[in-house]
Every structure is written in structure tokens, then in C-alpha cells.
Amino acid sequence: MENQPKLNSTKEVIAFLAERFPLCFSAEGEARPLKIGIFQDLVERVQGEMSLSKTQLRSALRLYTSSWRYLYGIKAGAIRVDLDGNACGQLDEQHVEHARKQLEEAKARVQAQREQHQAKKREAGEATAPRRPRKPARKPAAEGEQSRSVSGKPSRPQAARPASAPRAESRVEQRKPVTDTTALQVGQSIKVTAGKNAMDATILEISKDGVRVQLASGLAMIVRAEHLQF
């Protein structure tokens, strides 16, 4: 008996009871309603086994009978069972209603926790940089649109467009997308693509989550490598 293994957690105790009394307890699936006063039966039947104490048995019963799968089994017409699976009377309406309220409260708590977790994730997401990459091929068109908006005549200067296009292309060709952040250095000047524009920025920090840069406007943000160009 001195070398008998001990059950350290409440879940281990429940697993032991399911193995010891399979017609009464279950480790998974819908659980059967237990006989009223089954705690005393447990004390008498398993006293000394696996060095279990009354406190451990009481905690295991409390966890077992408050689980969702047990509460689902508490319904009208269900029969209580003893340790050997023998019928010990039908559930009354009071116990069924009590179990229903317990289940509703448990679900409400889980839903509230889930909504709180999602709210925290949304708050954290608002602090991150834009994550919608744009195709590089659209950048020259964006620069052309800017030049037309400055002139105020988007359709008439047709002859000037072929001359300005090579200059835009040459500027794009001079930039190279960043494929390896190890080639970057703190303090290095860099281009940040956001939407259809490329903005000047300075590298503040390089980490596994991205590159922290400061724009010419003074705004600091974390961006991913695909939004950076030399």
C-alpha cells in the first residue's frame, strides 16, 4: 500500500472513478445522473484505494456534476444510478430545472469571456499597420494620377505623358523590394508602400514581428517586409 500510486489532479480522480465504476461514471460523452448520497457510497467503496481522501472525492464529484455533459444528461425522465449502474429513482422537475439554469449560466459565462477576448484582439489590431498589400505594377499609374491632379487637366496633356512615364519607370526600377530583413539596419532610409503610394521612412527597430519605421511626418508604425523597398 505504501508504494500505491497517488492521483494528484481532480481529472485523474474522475478518470479513475470512470474505470472503477463504468456503469456509473463516464470519462467522455453524456453522463448519467448520479444517485443522491453517492458520495458516502464512494467513501465506503474506494476508501484507501489510490490514497484517495474525502476531499479529493468531494472535489471530483463537484467537478463531474457541474460539467456541461453531466448537466445535459439531467433532463425529464432520466433515471439516477448508483455505483453499479442500478436505477435509483427518476429525476424530479426541481432538479431538472436547476440543472437547466446551471447550464445556461455556464454558457453565458463562456460567451462573455469569448466576447471579451475578441474585444481585446480588436483593440490590439487597431494599433498595427495596414495589412493590405498592393500590386507594385499599379504604382506608376498612381504617380501619373498625382501629376494629372496637380496640373488640373487630367485629359489634355497627352504629349507629356510618354515623356514622364520613363522617368516613373526608372524610379521604380531603382527600388528593390525587401526580401530579407537581415539586410536592413537601424537608421537606414527606406521606402514604405501603403496603398498606391511609396513614402520615405527611417528604420527604428527590426524584430520578428516586422520592421518599426518612422515616416517623414513623424508617424511611427510596424510594417511587414513586403511593404518595404530600398
From Swiss-Prot:
InterPro entries: ProQ, ProQ/FinO, ProQ/FinO_sf, ProQ_C
Any one GO biological process: post-transcriptional regulation of gene expression
Species per Swiss-Prot/TrEMBL record: Erwinia tasmaniensis (strain DSM 17950 / CFBP 7177 / CIP 109463 / NCPPB 4357 / Et1/99)
Gene name tied to this protein: proQ
UniProt family annotation: Belongs to the ProQ family.
SUPFAM superfamilies in the cross-refs: FinO-like
Gene Ontology annotations for the cellular component aspect, listed alphabetically: cytosol
Pfam families on file: ProQ, ProQ_C
Annotated protein name in UniProt: RNA chaperone ProQ
Entries under NCBIfam families matching the protein: PRK04950.1
Basic and acidic residues: compositionally biased ranges: 105-125, 168-178
Low complexity: bias regions: 154-167
Biological role stated in the UniProt entry: RNA chaperone with significant RNA binding, RNA strand exchange and RNA duplexing activities. May regulate ProP activity through an RNA-based, post-transcriptional mechanism.
Subcellular compartments: Cytoplasm
Region (Disordered): 105-182
GO molecular function terms noted in the UniProt entry: RNA strand annealing activity; RNA strand-exchange activity
Chief location category: cytoplasm
Gene3D superfamilies the UniProt entry points to: ProQ/FinO domain
Keywords, ordered alphabetically: Chaperone, Cytoplasm, RNA-binding
The organism's place on the tree of life at top rank: Bacteria
